[in-house]
Structure formats: C-alpha cells, structure tokens
C-alpha cells in the first residue's frame, strides 16, 4: 500500500531470435507495476558489452517518457553498470534521487579473470571493462544510496572503487519464490527433464553433483569438470550434471559461450567422462526447481564454482529445495552460508579442495541431512520476498521523504595523484611470511584506500601473484 507505481524500464528488442514480448512497448504486470520497453539504438538483440554506444540514446528516450507521465518518480533505482550510466544522467536532469545496485562489479571481475589467466587485452576487448568501471564509478558518486546483497560486497568489492562510501551503502538480500522452490515432493522423476538427464548416465541413481549457470568464463565450469575428472573417488560416488543455458547449434551462440562450452566438452573427452556427466541441450524455466529437487532427492550437492559471485541466487534456490551447497568463497555465498549453515566455501581455483569437500558432503549421510534441513529453514527465515520488500522500503522511505539529505559526491576521480601517503611491501616475505598479522594489515589498507597508494613488490609471475593475493584476500594494489 505504500507503493503507488513501479515502472521497470528496459531496452525494447525487435528480433526474430527472441520472443515477440520483448518488442512490446508496455507490459502491464499488475495495477501498480509495468515493464516499459524503451527504444535504444538498433532494434535487434545485442549483448550487454555491445550496448555502451547506445546508452545515451536510451537515456534521451527514457527522459521523454518520464516527462510525458502525470507525475515524475520519487526515486530512480539503476541496476548494473549500463543502467547506472543511464540513471546518473536521469538523476541529474530530473533532480531525482538515484539508488544504485552494481551486482557484479567490473574491478572485481577483471581481478578474478586476470588471476585465472585471461590476458588484460582480452578482458578489455571481450567485456569493455574500462567503460564499465567508469560507469560504475560515476553511479557510485551520484547515488544517494547503494543497495547491496551482502556485507562482503561493501567491504571487498565496492572498497576497490574511488567513490567507495560505505556510509551510503545498505544490505538488502534478494528473496526467492518459496512456492516454486520447495522441498522434494516425490513427483520429480515423472518430469521430462529427468529423462533428458538420465540418457547421459550409465548409473542414473547415483547422487548428483549439480552445476547450473550461464556458459560464461566467469562461472568457472571447466574447473569443476576437471576437479571431478581428476578424482577417482568422486567419480565412483556421484554423477555430474551441468546445466549451462540452452543451445541448438553451438556455432550460432556468441563467442564467449562457444568458448566455454568447447572447453567443457573437451575436458569431458580428455577425462573420458562419458556416462558420468550429463549436459542436456535444453531446459525450460519451469524445469529449474525440478532439477534442484532431483539432485536433492539423489542425496547430491549443488556447486557454484564461480570466480566471484555477487550474491548467489541459485544457491538460495537450491537451499530452498533441501539441496546442500558448495560455493565460491568470493562474494555473497559467505553471507548465505553464515545465515543458512547448509554448506561450505571453497577456493574456486583449488580443484583438490573442491573434490575433497564434495566427497565429504556426499559420504556423511547424517551431516547431509542436517545441511539439507538447515538450508530449507534458513531460506524461509532470511530470504523470502516479503522480508526483502519490507527492508527495502525502510531504506527508501527517508529518501523519498527527504528526511535524509541528498548526497552527491564531487565527481573527481581519486587516482594516485590525490593520494597523500603510500605503502609498498613484499608479497612473499612480508605479507605471506606473517599470517597472524595479515588480516590486520588488510583491514588497515581497506580503511585507507581512498588516500593511500598501495604497492606490492614480487618476483612472481602476474597470474601467480594474483592467485596468491586472492587466496589470502589481499586487496588489489595500485602498483
């Protein structure tokens, strides 16, 4: 009742390769909510990395739409870097408070991709990462409130940015649909998706190690396949099921997805995992809850091996069905496991640790049951949509009422030119040589990043140094 109207603005797409719904300018969701599709550059589908040159056009058309309405919105809430770019312009032009949610952040993605061995120029070419980071910086400077999913985002991810202002940041975990994602009910094996999965497997009754994500390099699917393929014990205990989007002809997919799927299939062939790994070509959105429940019914585990995971909605969905989780230690999974106590965290690049944890979880039936029960209970307590909405409105209300002042930062970036102190240290002897003091050192660096140039000296190769820094949570240096 406190919300009069919600307009979700997104790009209008006219393309025979996607549903005709995406071409509809207006889609009414309820009496008080609708999707408004705004014209933006060319009509066809474009991946988000290719949208940057069209965003000013989107902002102009969005401004025309907003000014044509009976009343202007009280707030603008932008999600991801591209919408942050648009939101900063609309906020300035209309003098409306901006809220911003970055979700996955460019600086964090670049750091993790470098650590996994991807070259800097490849990252730039593939992801337009510099433009993305610039847009994120600008949105952080303009936004009155930054909404995050986890505390880890505030400290470890946003803390890497020039416009890091923790006093403006608020944690509101996303919710999940508990009517759709529910515990096992016995109907799972009657589904078509169960038959699709079984046709890959020699022993389909084994527990399932499940991975479900987009075919994206950042999701680190190949490392999971390698971890499985290198562990004879794990291969004896469980099947591996990979749900990585939908595909007809891989050659028609974008280059990034082609590369990931090619790596996965080559790895399956290298370790001769035929009959042990399922990788169905198609699934529907309605199949996803069933897939989780199939894995839970088998006594399996859901794995999210992503290099970094801003929140981890799939982990919440899996937990709601009673499926224990094993997840990357980088990002939102930390908060989820702290709240739900339903799994373990891993270094996503440590294949042995990944396999060992899976074996431990699959082998101990009593512990598995405890993790499954904890997950169902924890999701209901912490991750329902009603709890999410209530917390969000408590943050928005003082912004709308103007009971808290609108805060816009001076949009002058803080490169090293504006730092008034510097700290340089050796990686192996100084930092790794004193693990007891390392946590305190990291805390001090994080608290002073806005005024301090931080440098690391090392004889290691770049990929080796970044991997060690990630393992010990050492902030990315300026030099």
Identify the meaning behind each predicted range.
Residues 2-4, 231-234, 440-452:
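A short, Lys/Arg-enriched amphipathic alpha-helix followed by its capping loop at the start of a domain
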Residues 13-15, 430, 459-464:
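Short active-site-proximal "capping" loops at secondary-structure junctions
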Residues 203-207, 416-421:
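A short, charged/proline- and glycine-enriched loop
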Residues 222-226, 261, 438-442, 462-463:
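Short amphipathic alpha-helical segment that frequently serves as the phosphate-/nucleotide-binding helix
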